[in-house]
């Protein structure tokens, strides 16, 4: 139920009198972190974790996303943006405009935990161009923060791409 339509679907089923079952699991962000070796928190760089959406209903018309950019640009946290591939340039631009250093480590994790997973690592300044260069498509997560720079590549390191930030 993290930014997916799970809650909406459950409401619709309940309204129609259809029983449904929710099976607990892990979030896409947790799976991506484990699969790529990117820590979501790290006691030296990130004591907070923030999940946000990069896609809001109606946002496609003008490519804007209404988020608390000042809060998302704070230090000492990792920010994971769900559904943000289409608004990646705006997300990165707004974070920098609100005080996040351009050199902040950032990653795009495409198709996390699947065999065709790719992890593209750069900085908040370089990530939009890297996304275009490597043709990143949804589903993908954006992970931003100093903890991203603490990535420990898992055995095999399949799908890892780095821009040597």
Question: Which residues does each predicted region cover?
Answer:
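A short, small-residue-rich loop immediately preceding and capping a beta-strand
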Residues: 1
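A contiguous loop/helix-start segment that scaffolds small-molecule binding in enzyme catalytic cores
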Residues: 4-12, 18, 46-48, 53-165
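Hydrophobic beta-strand scaffold residues
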Residues: 20-22, 40
């Amino acid at each position: 139920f993290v930014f997916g339509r799970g809650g909406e679907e459950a409401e619709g089923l309940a309204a129609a009198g259809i029983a449904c079952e929710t099976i607990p699991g892990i979030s896409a962000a947790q799976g991506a972190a484990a699969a790529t070796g990117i820590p979501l928190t790290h006691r030296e760089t990130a004591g907070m974790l923030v999940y946000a959406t990069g896609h809001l209903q109606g946002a496609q018309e003008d490519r804007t996303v209404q988020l608390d950019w000042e809060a998302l640009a704070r230090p000492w946290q990792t920010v994971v943006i769900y559904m943000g591939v289409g608004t990646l340039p705006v997300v990165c631009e707004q974070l920098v405009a609100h005080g996040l250093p351009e050199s902040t480590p950032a990653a795009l994790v495409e198709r996390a935990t699947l065999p065709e997973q790719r992890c593209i690592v750069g900085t908040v300044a370089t990530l939009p161009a890297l996304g275009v260069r490597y043709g990143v498509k949804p589903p993908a997560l954006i992970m931003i923060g100093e903890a991203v720079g603490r990535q420990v590549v898992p055995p095999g390191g399949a799908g890892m791409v780095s821009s040597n930030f």
